[in-house]
Amino acid sequence: GAYHSLGLKSNGSIVAWGRNNYSQCTVPSPNSAFIAVAAGAYHSLGLKSNGSIVAWGRNNYSQCTVPSPNSAFIAVAAGAYHSLGLKSNGSIVAWGSNDYGQCTVPSPNSGFTAVAAGVSHSLGLREE
């Protein structure tokens, strides 16, 4: 993140450290069954083994408000004030700040195999 870091332990728990002014380092309970993490500027994301995303920290652009249905995610990424989730069907869900179009997923929203995010941009890798 901007001033915080996340680590995923082999037991599925998250370790967070650094600046905690928006509780971005306060991992919600239960801190278990995580398979991936991503750090935004002042928010954090954790992907659970059941395919749901847990988000916490600053929510000024709704970057921590995971859209429904919160299921079938296989990867996460976090920009400064936006979040991305890759679904098992190859589609991308994006939420939070869209000031620069970073949450506007190009059409067709399918065939993606990976996601990544920068400060104010998003990336999706297609299998083609």
Task: Give the location of each predicted region.
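Beta-rich catalytic cores
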Residues: 2, 33, 40-41, 72, ...
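Conserved core positions of repeat-based scaffolds
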Residues: 4-7, 16, 43-46, 55, ...
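Short glycine/serine- and acidic-residue-enriched loop/turn motifs that recur at repeat junctions
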Residues: 8, 18-30, 57-69, 86, ...
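Acidic/polar residues in short coil/turn loops that connect beta-strands
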Residues: 11, 50, 89, 127-128
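Short, hydrophobic beta-strand segments that form beta-sheet elements in well-ordered domains
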Residues: 16-18, 37, 55-57, 76, ...
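Blade-level signature of beta-propeller repeat domains, shared across WD40, Kelch, NHL, RCC1
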Residues: 116-128
